[in-house]
Structure formats: C-alpha cells, structure tokens
Swiss-Prot record:
Residues 26-39 have a biased composition (Polar residues). It is found in: Virion membrane. This is Protein P8. It comes from Pseudoalteromonas phage PM2. Keywords: Capsid inner membrane protein, Membrane, Transmembrane, Transmembrane helix, Virion. GO terms for cellular component: membrane; viral inner membrane; virion membrane.
C-alpha cells in the first residue's frame, strides 16, 4: 500500500525505489512557470516611446507644466 501511495504522490512507480523517498526529483518537476520563461518581444513601455515621434507631445506636456509652475509661483 505504501508503494501505491508513493506512486500516486508523484514518486517512483509501484514497486520502484525513488531516490527522494517518494518525492519527485527537482530536475523532473521544473516547469515553465519557474525557469523556462521566454522573452516577450511585444512589450511596450506603457505608451512612453523615447526616441520616436512623440516629441511634440513631450513639448506640450513640458510647456503645460512650466506654465502651471509660473502661475502658481505668481500667487
């Protein structure tokens, strides 16, 4: 019965000896969740693309920030 429990628990098959005493070996239990991750080529930085054609947007945001700073400083 102990051999059957070890087989169900992921260890060696019935009647076989497991080096980890019924526990699955670390090498065979690795999964894609832990060590086999691939890089994603589709990652974008949340719409912030430095070096692309967003220079006008950055200039507008900068001008608004400077304008608000000057208005607050006058009061």
């Amino acid at each position: 019965m102990l051999g059957a429990l070890m087989g169900v628990a992921g260890g060696a098959p019935m009647g076989g000896a497991s080096p980890m005493g019924g526990m699955p070996s670390i090498a065979s239990s690795s999964s894609a969740e832990t060590g086999q991750q691939t890089q994603s080529g589709n990652f974008t930085g949340g719409g912030i693309n430095f070096g692309s054609n967003n220079n006008n947007q950055l200039l507008i945001v900068g001008a608004v920030v400077i304008g608000l700073f000057l208005v607050i400083k006058r009061k």
